């Protein structure tokens, strides 16, 4: 699942390119996670537009709607409902140790919301609600899948075998794409000059690579 954006080029290399190769081997679900996106302030109309555009970009990159289930997260209320239940089986300390939370909290100390803190619980719900066996992720998301397994095991220990325990599926190539501006950091939309968007103009792409 990918949050709606202008279409990060690293998302294509790190995820979508690998997803296209998976669609003939597995039963796949691809989700535009617009609920995750609102952990930072969003313009509602713009978020809706970007969500639909992102689905269109998925299809343009080779994901076949006839072979995959493709949808927008907020259109399926069970994601939010299960997230609340799973949150009741998640420890505060587990969430406070999440590397991405610590990184984002350090960068945005004036806007540390409960939504940002519980982001991994909603991600766990995204996975467990579909009884997924494998979760295609980059290396930076492996910790979230491991937390998802821990939550599922804890829930299963109380109520019996309810959830499938997922495994991270990390591609050998493109598991972590680095910033054009800072090769020690992951490429991120928070640094527009350090990343390439799929919808960038050719001259903008060349400018970014020449400055790298």
Give, region by region, the residue ranges found by the protein language model.
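Single conserved hydrophobic/aromatic residue that forms the stacking wall/gate
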Residues: 1-8, 12
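Glycine-rich loop at the start of a catalytic domain that most often binds anionic cofactors/ligands
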Residues: 38-55, 81-89
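Histidine-anchored nucleotide/phosphate-binding helix
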Residues: 13-29
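Acidic, His- and aromatic-enriched active-site or binding-groove loops in soluble protein domains
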Residues: 90-101
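Active-site cores that bind ATP or allylic diphosphates and position pyrophosphate for catalysis
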Residues: 102-212
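Short, glycine/charge-rich beta-strand/loop segments that flank catalytic centers
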Residues: 66-80, 99-109
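Short, conserved active-site loops that position catalytic residues or coordinate cofactors/metal ions
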Residues: 28-41
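A glycine-rich helix N-cap at a beta->alpha junction
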Residues: 50-70
């Amino acid at each position: 699942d990918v949050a709606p954006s202008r279409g990060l080029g690293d998302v294509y290399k790190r995820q979508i390119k690998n997803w296209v190769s998976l669609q003939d081997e597995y039963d796949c679900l691809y989700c535009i996670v617009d609920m995750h996106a609102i952990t930072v302030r969003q313009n509602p109309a713009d978020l809706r537009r970007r969500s639909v555009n992102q689905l269109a970009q998925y299809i343009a990159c080779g994901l076949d709607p006839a072979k995959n289930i493709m949808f927008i997260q907020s259109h399926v209320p069970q994601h939010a409902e299960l997230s609340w239940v799973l949150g009741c089986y998640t420890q505060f300390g587990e969430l406070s140790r999440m590397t991405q939370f610590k990184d984002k909290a350090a960068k945005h100390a004036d806007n540390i919301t409960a939504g940002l803190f519980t982001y991994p619980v909603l991600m766990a719900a995204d996975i467990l609600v579909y009884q997924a066996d494998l979760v295609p992720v980059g290396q930076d998301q492996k910790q979230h899948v491991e937390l998802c397994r821990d939550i599922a095991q804890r829930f299963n220990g109380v109520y019996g075998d309810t959830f499938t325990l997922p495994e991270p599926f990390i591609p050998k190539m493109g598991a972590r794409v680095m910033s054009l501006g800072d090769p020690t950091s992951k490429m991120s939309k928070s640094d527009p000059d350090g990343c390439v968007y799929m919808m960038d103009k050719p001259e903008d792409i060349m400018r970014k690579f020449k400055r790298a």
